[in-house]
Every structure is written in C-alpha cells, then in structure tokens.
Amino acid sequence: MDATEITAAVAARGADEAPFVNLRDPAKRLGPDGQPAVSRRARIWEDVPDEKWNDWRWQLSKRLNTLEDLEQVLNLTDDEREGLSAPDKFRVDVTPYFVSLIDPDDPDDPIRRQVIPVGSELRAFTGMMEDSLAEDRHSPVPGLVHRYPDRVLMLITTQCASYCRYCTRSRIVGDATQNFNRRELEAQLEYIRRTPQVRDVLISGGDGLTLAPKLLESALRGLREIAHVEIIRIGSRVPVFMPQRIDDELCEMLQKYHPMWLNIHVNHPNEMTPELARACDKLSRAGIPLGNQSVLLAGVNDCVHIQRDLVQKLVEIRVRPYYIYQCDLVEGAGHFRTPVGKGLEIIEGLRGHTSGYAVPQYIVDAPGGGGKIPVMPNYLISYSDHKVVLRNYEGYITTYEEPTSYTPHDRAGCAWCQNPRPEPGQEGITGLLDGKKMWIEPAGFIETHARGNEEAHRLQDPSKWVPYGVGALEGQAGQPLPVLQSGAAGGDTGGASAGSPSGASAYGPGEEPRPAEGQPNATANHELL
C-alpha cells in the first residue's frame, strides 16, 4: 500500500470512526477481502486449505527438489535443466511458499536465481575454494568456529528450509551425513564453558530454526547456563523461506533466553511479503532486535536502486540492515560474483541518500580466514596535524579543525584500560595503538631477512631492535627507558631542530619559507590544510 492508497483509506474510514488502525504498519495490512494480506500461491497449491499452507511442518514436507517437481510450477530453461540434472549438484529444496514468489515465466527472476541451480554452477573459477573463509581452520571442535576474540559461531545443524545457491558452507550444508551429533554439540558447549573470554554466541548452521523446538531449546538452555555468555544471536533465513515457522510458541520460547538477537537474510525487495512482515512483527514483540544480512549477487541485487528499495522496506518492518557481503569464493558461486567496486557504488548510493539506520556495512569476508573486512567509500580527503579535510555524499568538501587543548585519556588511571577483556593472540592493530607492540611481522619474516646467514654476525644483536617502553611483539614486556649519556631520561626532545635553539624558527620575524624559483606554491595548493 503506497502513500496515496493510505490517504484514501483514511479518508474513506472517516474522522470519527474507531478504533484507529495504523495502515502504515506492514504487519497489519489487509488484502482486497479485508483479511490480512497474503502472497500469491502457485497454481498447484491454490486449493490447499489455509491451515495446511500456514503449517511450517507442511511447508517442509512439501519442498520441491527435483526437475520434475520444479517444472510443475516454473517454465525451466535449458540452463536450469542442466543444473538440476547434475549428479553432484549442491542440494536443492524450495518451500512451496518461497517458490510461489517466483515469476514462472521470467528466467531472470531475482528469487529464482537464488534457489534454482543452473549449469554455470558446475564451472570452476580462479580463486575458488571449498572453505573460502577457512572456518574449519578456526574450529577447536567440530561445528564451533572461534575466529574473533570474544565470540564464537556455533553450527548446530546442517539443514535449512531452502538452500541458497551461493552458500558459503556448501561443503557441509544440506548433507545429512555431516550433521552434528549430541557428543559434538556437547563438545561445543564444553569449549565455551572453559573459554571465559567468549561473551557472544552466534547460532547458525544450516539454520537453527529448522530444528525441532525441543532440540533448539536444549541448545539455548545449555548456553544460558554458562555465566560468561552475555548474548545469544541466531542467524536464520527461515523467516524469509518459511515465515509460517515464526509462531507464538516459538517466540514465547525464544524470549525466555534473553538477551537474544536475530539476523534474517533478505536479498531483494520481492522477498518482502506480508507474511515476512508479520513474522518479524512477532519476533520484535517478543523483544528480539532484528537485523538483516544480505549478499551482493550479480543479476539479483547489484543495483543501487534495488538496494535502496530493499533497505527502506526492511526498516519499515523494524529490521535494521546490518551487513551486505561480497559474494564468497565458494564452489558454485562464480556466476554470482561482482567487482568490489559495485559494492562501493551501492554504499555511495545509500549513505546520505537514505536514513543512516538503513545503510548496512559492506563486508569482504577475507579469503583464507582473515575475517570480515569493512569496505566503504573514502570520505577523508586529507589531513594535517591540526585539521582534516572531508567530503560528504554530495561532494561538498569541508574541514574540521582539530582541538589544540585536548588532554589525552589517562590510561594509567582508567580501570577499563588496566583491566581489559583478554584477547590472547588477537590484539592486531589495537595492540599497536595501545602501545603493547610496535610492529606486526608476517609469518616467516625473520627467516626471510636472515638471508641464509647461519653464522654469528658481529653486528647482529636482537636487543638493538627492541623498542624501549614498548613490547615489540605481543606478550613481550616493554624495556624501561634508559638514562642517556646527557644525563636526561630518554624521551621526546620537544621538537627542537638541529642548529636551531629550543626549536626557534630558522626564518626571521615575519618571514615565510619561499618556494624555489619555478616551483609551485605549496601553501596555495594546500590552503584548506
């Protein structure tokens, strides 16, 4: 319902009519029959009773997964037939609800591209990997990924309601033989129990919301019994593939385990249905904050205007756009990949052009296991020791004067600085800024630069390159500052230049340094600074 239709409906209802109905709320919108709005159904399910259609177990049991199933509802292309006929294809399963959203006659339908295999899935591409994020490298026990200091990813199932063709975990997802047994799930919990730095657990898979309610609750209860686990998150596409699953019983169970957060996965505005709006409304009313993680996909959402429509519709149903991921280098996803520049173009078209709440972070999940790297357009043009030069989304260029009397934060007197949460082995750049170390060496750096020298070298003394007052590498204690030969404690010289007493200017009163003849005037070129 657009703004014109809402205005007309309000006028028709009359000013004195009660009770008030919020026609802007997507979860309360009505269809032509005056009943809650619903999405279309494919013709083969037109006569299915509503009580069956709205039963999530029925939706799971009636999923389409073969060429013969899908040609009942879609006019398949030769490319799709090739993909569906491949013996080693990634699993196919599509709920009746989700396949009904597809235009049966449009081979480029954006929902269709996400769930129907094509022949190009079978082609390898440069950089392709089975586990492009190296999750299994960061896995202390099967199904648990500990990549970041204070949080873990807990995979509790390999099953989903439907299967995305670009799935980053296609190496295990959809394969019932890869499911995690009770012993492995207990090992995941035991690792979390003995690792007190873990304060945040993300439940994923597969999709945890496909589990039987008792199994899901057992996992949640196990986590809530661990005192140092502060928040639990769930990553799920069930509200999108099968919104019927989000019923009162599930929401009542989830809210027992607060604080609880949930991220859904919507890629295109065509997925924004009345059913999804009502599912998200139920979750929000259960006190669960909602976010959205989407993937940038060629032929689906690689368009600024599609993305702007999507994020605006998401915030309307109280779902905050969280991440938009660059497509991973996984098997079967080559035809979905876009240049990173396309993602930057999309963020450029969102930031400033729509609400800040509607702008997600653009993320490249580093191949090889480097983790999530946020990428964004550059709004910092230049800087000096006293100001920065910035530009906004319109190209407006401005400067921000840095303060001249800033008193740095007193780390020695700060209880938080003196008692930080432990991040063993993962301080990274923060460790450099905190002064805990002065550089980061890549693996093999020392061996490479030894240049094969195996004998004692009279000039080589490792103590020469250990900085005073700083631990050069993580875990090293900083050496105390020495007393220099001048008798003064080591430290800054105050900025005095050689040949100039106490930093006095080398120029006379009123004089300025002049550029050499024929050279451009640097002051003119940097007048903003």
Model-identified regions with their sequence ranges:
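Long, compositionally biased intrinsically disordered regions
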Residues: I6-V10, D281-R285, M376
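C-terminal accessory regions of radical SAM enzymes
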Residues: I347-Q460
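Short, charged beta->alpha transition segments
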Residues: S139-P142, V152-L155, E186-R193
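Short acidic, glycine/serine/threonine-rich loops at helix termini
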Residues: Y166-T168, K214-L215, I246, V375-M376
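Conserved AdoMet/S-adenosylmethionine-binding subsite of the radical SAM
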Residues: E186-D200, G206-T354
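C-terminal non-catalytic accessory extensions
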Residues: D2-A3, P420-G495, G499-L529
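Flexible, acidic/Gly-rich N-terminal and inter-domain linker regions that tether
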Residues: M1-H146, L481-Q485, D492, S500, ...
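Canonical Radical SAM [4Fe-4S] cluster-binding loop centered on the CxxxCxxC motif
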Residues: H146-R183, I234, H526-E527
